């Protein structure tokens, strides 16, 4: 039992949906914490709204509440479960803010709940900018010259006093949200107003900019007795001025002198002791590169993105140790899980280099402002481990899946030196490639260091890589001798990177390596620099003499992970990978995971029998397969990242379990798939590939408008659009053919029907559908951005039977063994197939939890040859539950400047929440609250700008809103429509007309909700785009789908109140 015998039942608050600034790292740390508490015999109650997580599985906590993360719903859980304690620091900023609010409102006191781990007072001292500054003053800790402000007037006065640029940091926000660097009073007006609005306590810290100083982080653990260790220190390659979540980070720090290292280490420990932290804490410093001057930027008195990185970089399980400290244990009483010999009071030591590189969503949002600053924009990250910096960095670059295997980027070849300088002075996600091009042109290293703020140590490393690339470019393959190839491999060059420079095939380099026996060995991450034997096999590749992998002769399977979190491929795929591993382990099969994401549960050291922290490229995966010689490789759970390895593994005669490469190709190749549908007599929307604007117009005439147009070979709906007339179609096609003349544009009849989705399992003979899901929004909104309902609410028995029939025909026709995801449209009583994915999809965690069918477990067993009829869940459509569960998407577009907000065929959401209720309205109400949609407001003002073809449908919804007491503001045509129906409306000028116009209405806070149905997709020159962006940047609700608006209005009519709703424990 825990040292503190009074702790019997602990409430853990999760972090909710994945948004930019708060991603999968909290699933990893929350899962670890729950396990750590349960190991000590403590009952764990969890509240978290995110169904895509491992954390919300029924076996992770004793009681699992997938409910909105608001004070009202957390109080309901506390009232029902009566925990004696609350652990606040595992749910990111969301969990911390909730814990503080529960404390301030007296709810914790009312129910006798104690906060364990770091106290609320200590959390406030770490999070409240003014209290933190007072602590620093008390211990003589240097801080940057700053002022705490709560209004615009004082903010401007301070800025005028110390001069620009000024850094704006709101209190209690996430990932730098609402912050930024103001270079002028005009910029300060905009950033400060938003920062004050988004801070939960209306407080902002303004500080003098030390942009260009080094940014250093320490991850520190402290127990209740004051024992303190630094787990890991990390150096941001990018200087202060770029959010640490958007920075390239290296561990351990590479450029600090011993004096600097010890100085900052002592300062970190001093801060933790002064605040009284109990658990993990992240401390961020700014260090003057030209002196020993430093300042504390901020601390995070909780587990964080950096603590997940530090855990994976060192093998030290920070969240688990923090949970034990919260129970009263001291560091010298907690065993190191990796070595089982040392204790948690031993500081880890690293004999390797770790590099973290962020993954940005700009491939999805090509019009976005890519310049990096103090506001985080990355959706995820990769981690790479090497025996030297160059190896780790090059591994990291190819792990990003951006098609880069070197530091060369074609588009920078055309730029002048002045243009390249601009690209690194205003750094964006591609700055390293611009920097490399400058070095390629012999720009002086000290000058590059000066203008970028990147230490000369790193510039020298990049220079060496660039010089080797240049040397290869000027060579032939015959010039490549054994010694040179070994040196390149040791420094992280890939076969493809070398081959591209030599203009040969990667296979040629692979052949040479085999002739010369230049193959990687694998070293272990052991937390102690090899001083003690590690029991948890966690490996990285290097080109060295001694190999630390022991290859067994057991039956074994390699599971390929899904890589970094990104829009379209999120935490859902990590959930599936982890469940696959658990299923294999239950069957007594040795499990091996290959992945490169430091935020996830799959890369925890004790999930699989072996973990290889490696890039998910053909070469890196093949090296592991050749080392381990598994009985098979599973690709179905790693999203497109894993699936795209299928053909390569087939060419190498490597067995993939389940669906084969040819079968995957049948589902993904349009022509082959069309042939199959024809053969099976299954309908799909009519369409074809076209090669010119004229062809497109001709085809559209045959099909009839509206039509869905999209480029060939895209993922996540990228570049898709619905066009309603010839003018829109010509505009889309002209742009599309200008970008890509080599591939056809696909044009389909757009059916404005009901979209229905299934995740099914096939064993080659039978099919099991755990649940049929219905989308609230009509077809045309990407399935990942749609509200999903289960059980279906409007699907007839006949259509359900047809869905089962088509699913079985398709699964058996393709030859699926394992998972298949199918999307259907029901239109005018007919059923059409629109898409088939021969793998696990993003709805698997959701439907697994709400149907209570262990989908991944069953699919894994089927891949290994078992039959559905023997697995206890039958075949056909599984029985439907009584409760209704909705999955509501969550967006991060506010954090991405110049990004389109409206829903369409291209996916934009970063996360999701679950709403569970006895009725659809109750479930939707909870889902909307959990997704932070402003649904509780009784009345307000709606700004409506409605597209012509939506006006008729909008009218009855507008009448309902009017009857509820809402007022309207609208532009001319929409205003006329409302007036004709007797609805009072204030007419407002359009964007191009003189002030006050529609944008002024938004900026002057005259509006509570914006309803805008767009006319032309992603054209940022149009009024609608600017209206939506202005609203989202003022933190207003923006609705672009009338289906969503109708659902919200229906809920308001039901007058649902928090106090009347039930909460549901989904662990049973």
Swiss-Prot record:
Annotated InterPro entries: ATP-grasp (IPR011761), ATP_grasp_subdomain_1 (IPR013815), CarbamoylP_synth_lsu (IPR006275), CarbamoylP_synth_lsu_oligo (IPR005480), CarbamoylP_synth_lsu_oligo_sf (IPR036897), CbamoylP_synth_lsu-like_ATP-bd (IPR005479), CbamoylP_synth_lsu_CPSase_dom (IPR005483), MGS-like_dom (IPR011607)
Region of interest (Allosteric domain), residue spans: 933-1068
One cellular component term (GO) for this entry is:
cytoplasm
Q: Which UniProt keywords apply?
A: Amino-acid biosynthesis, Arginine biosynthesis, ATP-binding, Ligase, Magnesium, Manganese, Metal-binding, Nucleotide-binding, Pyrimidine biosynthesis, Repeat
Domain MGS-like: start-end pairs: 933-1068
- Annotated region (Carbamoyl phosphate synthetic domain) at 550-932
Tell me how the cofactor is bound: Binds 4 Mg(2+) or Mn(2+) ions per subunit.
Positions with a binding annotation for Mn(2+) 2: 298, 300
Claim: Phosphoprotein is one of the keywords in the record: no
Query: In which residues is Mn(2+) 3 bound?
Result: 823, 835
How does this protein assemble? Composed of two chains; the small (or glutamine) chain promotes the hydrolysis of glutamine to ammonia, which is used by the large (or ammonia) chain to synthesize carbamoyl phosphate. Tetramer of heterodimers (alpha,beta)4.
Entry domain remark: The large subunit is composed of 2 ATP-grasp domains that are involved in binding the 2 ATP molecules needed for carbamoyl phosphate synthesis. The N-terminal ATP-grasp domain (referred to as the carboxyphosphate synthetic component) catalyzes the ATP-dependent phosphorylation of hydrogencarbonate to carboxyphosphate and the subsequent nucleophilic attack by ammonia to form a carbamate intermediate.
Entry protein name: Carbamoyl phosphate synthase large chain
The task this protein performs is described as:
Large subunit of the glutamine-dependent carbamoyl phosphate synthetase (CPSase). CPSase catalyzes the formation of carbamoyl phosphate from the ammonia moiety of glutamine, carbonate, and phosphate donated by ATP, constituting the first step of 2 biosynthetic pathways, one leading to arginine and/or urea and the other to pyrimidine nucleotides.
Residue positions annotated to bind Mg(2+) 3 are 823, 835
List GO molecular-function terms, semicolon-separated: ATP binding; carbamoyl-phosphate synthase (ammonia) activity; carbamoyl-phosphate synthase (glutamine-hydrolyzing) activity; metal ion binding
Per the UniProt record, which EC number(s) apply here? 6.3.4.16, 6.3.5.5
